[in-house]
């Protein structure tokens, strides 16, 4: 069994999801969205993201993390804030000793849907199908779960490829 936390970072909404894989079958453990108060300073929001991710990791004990990479925003300040929120989440994972993998949004979409330009709705649908549940969660949560599923899928493929290579 392997347990992964997927994270869709954001300074206002950080989606997260824990997925277990047992014998190639994916199971949803828990998921949600971290929403720091907009009343506090930006540094307080980052601290909140760090603390919440740390608490989630301590509670659910994932051993690996998959984090969506920052897209290139048109506004440099937005990109900077998104990068800082992502950094808070990554440091929380690293602080707990998790192996961390980064994935571009197009890679996540291609892995789940089959093409890198999939809509949020298509990704959410495939997340639900992959986990055997009806997707009734926010988009940030869906994106985080998609990140975890992408990681588990790529990991499974790499493990199989390595086993085949050893036999050659």
Swiss-Prot record:
Q: How is the cofactor bound?
A: Binds 2 Mg(2+) ion per subunit.
State the Gene Ontology BP annotations.
DNA recombination; DNA repair
> SUPFAM superfamilies, alphabetically?
Ribonuclease H-like
What EC number is given for this enzyme? Answer: 3.1.21.10
Key words of the record: Cytoplasm, DNA damage, DNA recombination, DNA repair, DNA-binding, Endonuclease, Hydrolase, Magnesium, Metal-binding, Nuclease
Q: Which GO terms describe its cellular component?
A: cytoplasm; Holliday junction resolvase complex
- Name any cofactors this protein relies on: Mg(2+)
Single Gene Ontology MF annotation:
crossover junction DNA endonuclease activity
What reaction does this enzyme carry out catalytically?
A: Endonucleolytic cleavage at a junction such as a reciprocal single-stranded crossover between two homologous DNA duplexes (Holliday junction)
- Binding-site residues for Mg(2+) 1, renumbered to this chain: 8, 140
User: Carries keyword Cell inner membrane?
Assistant: no
Do you know which InterPro entries this protein is assigned to? Answer: RNaseH-like_sf, RNaseH_sf, X-over_junc_endoDNase_RuvC
Which one Pfam family would you cite for this protein? RuvC
> Which superkingdom does the taxonomy of this entry point to?
Bacteria
State the compartments where it is located: Cytoplasm
User: Record-annotated residues binding Mg(2+) 2?
Assistant: 68
Query: What residues make up the catalytic site?
Result: 8, 68, 140
Kindly give the NCBIfam families that the UniProt entry links to this protein.
ruvC (TIGR00228)
Role: The RuvA-RuvB-RuvC complex processes Holliday junction (HJ) DNA during genetic recombination and DNA repair. Endonuclease that resolves HJ intermediates. Cleaves cruciform DNA by making single-stranded nicks across the HJ at symmetrical positions within the homologous arms, yielding a 5'-phosphate and a 3'-hydroxyl group; requires a central core of homology in the junction. The consensus cleavage sequence is 5'-(A/T)TT(C/G)-3'. Cleavage occurs on the 3'-side of the TT dinucleotide at the point of strand exchange.
Give the quaternary structure. Homodimer which binds Holliday junction (HJ) DNA. The HJ becomes 2-fold symmetrical on binding to RuvC with unstacked arms; it has a different conformation from HJ DNA in complex with RuvA. In the full resolvosome a probable DNA-RuvA(4)-RuvB(12)-RuvC(2) complex forms which resolves the HJ.
> What family does the Swiss-Prot or TrEMBL record give for this protein?
Belongs to the RuvC family.
Supply the name of the protein: Crossover junction endodeoxyribonuclease RuvC
Q: Specify the taxonomic lineage.
A: Bacteria, Pseudomonadati, Thermodesulfobacteriota, Desulfovibrionia, Desulfovibrionales
